[in-house]
Each structure stands twice: as C-alpha cells, then as structure tokens.
Amino acid sequence: MRSKVTGAQRWVVKIGSALLTADGKGLDRNAMGVWVEQMVALHEAGVELVLVSSGAVAAGMSRLGWTARPSAMHELQAAAAIGQMGLVQAWESSFAEHGRHTAQILLTHDDLSDRKRYLNARSTLRTLVELGVVPVINENDTVVTDEIRFGDNDTLAALVANLVEADLLVILTDRDGMFDADPRNNPEAQLIYEARADDPALDAVAGGTGGALGRGGMQTKLRAARLAARSGAHTVIVGGRIERVLARLKGGERLGTLLSPERGMLAARKQWLAGHLQTRGTLVLDDGAVAALARDQKSLLPVGVKLVQGSFRRGEMVVCVAQDGREIARGLSNYSAIEAQKIIGHSSESIVRELGYMAEPELIHRDNLILV
C-alpha cells in the first residue's frame, strides 16, 4: 500500500505550528530551512507540491510578547495579521536560496463554498503548480468569523487536497502517527501503520486536543484524512521530527499512519461538494430513502423524507441522516426549509398541488449529492 505514497505525483504538505516555532518564541528559521531542503528535493524528484503552513498566529504572538493563545477572535486576528507577514517572508527567502518561487494564498470557507470562487481558486493553484511555484496556503484569519472558519489547518489542508486533486496529503505533527492507545500514558501503545480512513475503530483512539499554539489534535487530523479521502487522496499522519521524513516517505519507508480512501477520485462537481463544511439544515430520511441513496445512489425524493430541521434556502447544503441519526449524505437542496416542510412525505407529482409550482421533482438531485 505504500506504493500509493511513492507513486504520488501531487502532494499537499501541512506543517503545524509546533514544528515551525522555537518553543513558541517566534519562527524557527533553521527548522524552516530544513523543511525547504526536503521540499526542494521532492520538487527535483518530480513531485508537484502545495504547502499549507501554520504558524502565523504563533509568530504574531511572539512579536506581541503574548505567551498564551488568546480566545477572543479580534486578538487572534490581530496576531495572525502580524505573524502572516513574517511567516510568508521566511518561506519566500528560504525557498529563494534554492531558486524556487513561492506564492501566498489566503483562503476562507466562503472561497470554497461558492462554486465560481472555488473554480477560480482551483485554476490559480493549478497554474502555480504547473509553473513549478510552491503555493504557501493559510486561512485568511483576519476576515473570518466563527461561522465561516475552517477551524484548523488540518481541515484546510484536506480541502486544499480536494481543490488541487492531490494524490497525497501529508500531515506533519509532533507525534509519530496514530496509535492504538495514548503513548503518553501507555508504554505498550502500538503505531497504526495503515488503515482505511473511514474505519470507525479509529475514532476511539483519536482522542486529545491541540497544543497551546495550535488548534488541531489527532481527532482533527483523522477528520481531515476522511475529508481528503472523499476526493480520492491518501493521507499520511507522521512525526515532523523524524529526520528526512519527506524523503523517506517518498522512498517507501513505513513511517507514520497511512489512511486510505474507500473510493477513487470523485467527479469535479462532487469534489466541490465534498469541500462544503457549513450545513444549514438536516433532512431525516426513512429506510427506503436511505437505501436509495446509499445503495443505489439515486436522487432524494420528497416522499422519502420524514422530518426537516433547521433553516435553509434553495441551493444551500443540508445533511441527510437516517432515523437513528447516522449521517448518510450531504447535498444542495432544491427547496427552502419552508417549502420542504410542505412537500415531504408526498410524491413528486404532488409538489405542484402543495406549493403551486415545482422547481424540481427531486428534493436533492443525485448530481448535487455526496455520500459520506
């Protein structure tokens, strides 16, 4: 299975704050230089590379003399704005020593939720990669709100992997990978070398939260791997302090935890759908509708919906769940929540009678539906 790593042509590499800062005292230029040497070596081996870099908030905190990560949004945004300048300059100067160009890309969830902006971002990133430029991506912390933020750069990296149709997502962390128990408390804990990203057994061993400088613990990394898997990408969660870790992964060594997708790459539109994290409502399905979606991959008809929850407009993303609460799919609703309330449980032929018009015969068309 490690051939999926050695043969990957397009990598997204995410480096966390703890690996880029000197114990929280600003950016570690020497460490960044070592990372650049490894990434340049990948470039020279023919790998197309996109870098998702944490560290802006940590760098800003250092410049401001703060020792504890603030909880107030405006303080986080101020730290990010200050730190982002130094972070990008550090990457640029380090890559320039090897004759490589970099490009700064700041994204928000809105950029990926809007189809037109998603396509524009994808086109720009693909062009940069084809030019041999290394895009350096971070969340645009200065403009996001709690409602539209990605939450952590692990999630952002997974969505970038979706965006650029990456073969491989590498999440570098301060742990050697995922273990079957917490190695900090259990000396018998064993590294999980390979697993399916959707294996439910992983949830039980992915406990823990992020450190003082970062937001993402192992749970967020598992969630990121599952997001990346939706678009067919493999994910390696691996220790960033392992010497020459990127080169050794490329060489086929069994380092870290390799999480593999169940399905191959999605069609372009469904890749975009997979990048939606913000949902506006929930549709509770009967057993027949669950089978139609999960087994037969059909459209969702009003007759198969038992309950509408939340407030959403036509074209917004909703979650489809079974009656026991299991999430089955996500999709773009053809009707608002108010309209959906009136037509659920009825056949498509009855929509005109209930509403006085029919926008579409389906509540969610299968082209706008993605199984989870």
Curated annotation (Swiss-Prot):
Protein name: Glutamate 5-kinase
Subcellular location: Cytoplasm
Pathway it works in: Amino-acid biosynthesis; L-proline biosynthesis; L-glutamate 5-semialdehyde from L-glutamate: step 1/2
Annotated NCBIfam families: proB
Function: Catalyzes the transfer of a phosphate group to glutamate to form L-glutamate 5-phosphate.
Coarse class of the protein's main subcellular location: cytoplasm
Top EC class, one word: transferase
Binding site residues for substrate: 54, 141, 153
Protein family according to the UniProt entry: Belongs to the glutamate 5-kinase family.
UniProt-listed GO biological process terms: L-proline biosynthetic process
Catalytic activity field: L-glutamate + ATP = L-glutamyl 5-phosphate + ADP
List of residues binding ATP: 14, 173-174
A Gene Ontology term for the protein's cellular component: cytosol
Any one GO molecular function term: ATP binding
